[in-house]
Amino acid sequence: MSRHVTVVLLLAIVLLLSSHMIHGQHWSYGLRPGGKREVESLQESYAEVPNEVSFTELQHLECSIPQNRISLVRDALMNWLEGENARKKI
């Protein structure tokens, strides 16, 4: 009796693993196994992309309030330390 249970359990495990492996490979249209595309299909898709890309002029943004980086770091550190001290008091 225990041998039959073992065989049934092993068969169930094999079926579960095999069904997982069967559905694990996904092939899309135009793809070969492993996700490799054919060279011809890639050349066609690149031919559709325009060769020239127009770049817009970059806008230089400035902050209206001049701040020093060191003061920003100092303020952030002070805020963090105040939070740590408040936690220690609780």
Swiss-Prot record:
The modification Glycine amide is found at residue 34. Residues 1-24 form the signal peptide. Coiled coil: none annotated. It holds the Pfam family GnRH. Forebrain. Keywords: Amidation, Cleavage on pair of basic residues, Hormone, Pyrrolidone carboxylic acid, Secreted, Signal. GO terms for molecular function: gonadotropin hormone-releasing hormone activity. GO terms for cellular component: extracellular space. The modification Pyrrolidone carboxylic acid is found at residue 25. One of its GO terms (biological process) is reproductive process. It comes from the Eukaryota. Its main location: secreted. It is found in: Secreted. PANTHER family: GONADOLIBERIN (PTHR10522), PREPROGONADOTROPIN-RELEASING HORMONE 2 (PTHR10522:SF5). Stimulates the secretion of gonadotropins. Belongs to the GnRH family. This is Progonadoliberin-1.
